[in-house]
Design a protein with these regions (language model features):
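Conserved beta-strand-loop-alpha-helix junction that forms the acyl-donor binding cleft
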Residues: 110, 136-147
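Acetyl-CoA-dependent GNAT
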Residues: 50-108, 119-120, 125, 180
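Conserved acetyl-CoA-binding loop-helix of GNAT-fold acetyltransferases
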Residues: 111-126, 148-152
Length: 181
């Protein structure tokens, strides 16, 4: 595979009837569907316009170029559950060692432990990755499930940007959480 974090952790992790594995280009359509569902039906992401598969393929290639993990959760029967990654926060030449997490679950997978499995694998990968010092999670303040999930893994609330996006007829605030790995 050739990316450092894969050398420090198993390529495939099986957790309680769930498989966590590296993402490939074949996963991009399902990943894009999940992202677009969140864009169109929730306020957990500020973006208002849907993503294209080509755009998300380019983004996955960028993640790989940055030597960062992008993970997929599948049920033991092979059903896609969601995805997670971390990538450099802003300009990595300035924000040395600082990476931002992203997690999206299929709407049918929410509340089944997929988020816990993905974030656990992501934190483990970050702890094994010499270039990572800090993980950030920028979460819409009304997304209580995601806030609690990150806090379960030791992320601490380090501040909130108030009313920074207007979507679905209301203002959204963005909570910043941080984990030093």
């Amino acid at each position: 595979v050739g990316r450092r974090f894969f050398l420090a952790m198993p390529t495939i992790v099986i957790l309680a009837a769930m498989l966590i594995r590296p993402a490939g280009l074949a996963d991009v359509p399902a990943m894009t569907d999940t992202l677009n569902w969140a864009i169109e039906h929730t306020d957990v992401i500020f973006r208002a316009s849907p993503a294209s598969i080509a755009e998300r393929e380019d983004y996955l290639r960028h993640i790989w170029k940055e030597d960062c993990p992008c993970l997929i959760a599948e049920s033991d029967s092979g059903d896609y559950l969601g995805w997670a990654l971390y990538d450099p926060y802003r300009d990595p030449r300035v924000w040395t060692g600082c990476y931002e997490t992203t997690i999206y679950l299929s709407p049918t997978a929410q509340g089944q432990g997929a988020g816990t499995a993905l974030l656990g694998a992501l934190v483990d990968a970050a702890r094994a990755d010499d270039k990572v010092h800090s993980l950030l999670a920028l979460i819409v303040s009304t997304n209580v499930a995601s806030l609690k999930l990150h806090e379960k893994f030791g992320f601490e609330n380090v501040g909130t940007l108030k009313e920074v996006c207007y979507k679905f007829d209301h203002w959204l605030s963005l909570t910043h959480l941080q984990l030093l790995v």
